[in-house]
Amino acid sequence: MIYSCFDIGGTAIKFGLIDETGRFRKKGSLPTEAQTEGGPGIVHKVCSLIHRQLTDHPLEGIGLSTAGIVDTERGSIDYALSIPGYTGTDWKGILEKEFHLPCIVENDTNCAALGEWWLGAGRDMASLFAVTVGTSIGGAFIENGHILHGASRAAGEIAYMRVPAGRLHDVASATYLCREIACKKAADPEKVDGRTCFAWVRQGDATAAAVLDTFCQNLADGLANIACLCNPDGIVLGGGIMAQEAILRPRLEQALAARLPKMMLPPKGLAFAQRQNDAGMLGALYLLQQKK
């Protein structure tokens, strides 16, 4: 059985043909072109891809992991700040009418968390809180394969969480880290990305290391709040910069241990995402199979 799964972000649309075990038969990506083509352009790209896939493979269903706040019952986009013309997109209605296949739609952070719980860093955890650190910072709570959505489907929107240094988005995102290091080093911010920042840290740059330490302290404030509130088995950290586990793990573990008594720390500690770019599609597949 083959399923068509997508992970729709502001920059790229990732897609894959996946079997029921989570094995990818084919995958790829294409630019979202969100600012020029908006929501209607994304719908056109996805539908065109599925039509091409169907010429080679019969499909069992379609799973969408997508940016934005999602009405999972209706399968539509309630709100999407970063993609013009995307709010209100009725994905489920469009896809089921066009292809006559079962379809699920879920928020991308929720799907990534579920993918890590099913086939990634959270496989041995009954419950986990996933934190994705990138342009902003997002979260999702999974317990026994179920996503906590909240009353208005905004559970896990930790970007708005307040910590001593300010709003978590403003003080614990990859955007913050790169911007602050560029500012402190008087470098062109357009030329400073995560790779540049961690290269400086590895080279022993004191300025970059000091900013990274502040970033880790700020992030640990947020993680401590999450541990107190949700008491998960573990916290899974994802996003591009979390590939730097060797540098980040000791700093974050030390900072978290300084904030909480041992009994309140996640029993299985911090884990770093294993499935990365595939996690959202795997989470969508898991939900699709649960629907059957």
Region locations from a protein language model:
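ATP-binding/phosphotransfer module of carbohydrate and carboxylate kinases, centering on a glycine-rich
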Residues: M1-G61, T72-S76, G93-L101, G115-M125, ...
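Short hydrophobic alpha-helix segments
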Residues: K27-L30, L81, A151
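A short acidic/small-residue loop/turn micro-motif
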Residues: T32-A34, G85-Y86, A155-E157
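Short glycine-rich anion-binding loops that position phosphate/pyrophosphate groups of nucleotides
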Residues: A67-V70, G134-S136, I241
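A charged helix-plus-loop insertion that forms the helical arch/lid used to bind
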Residues: S76-T87
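General beta-strand structural signal in soluble alpha/beta enzymes
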Residues: C103-N107
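Glycine-rich phosphate-binding loop of actin/hexokinase-like ATP-binding domains
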Residues: R123-T175
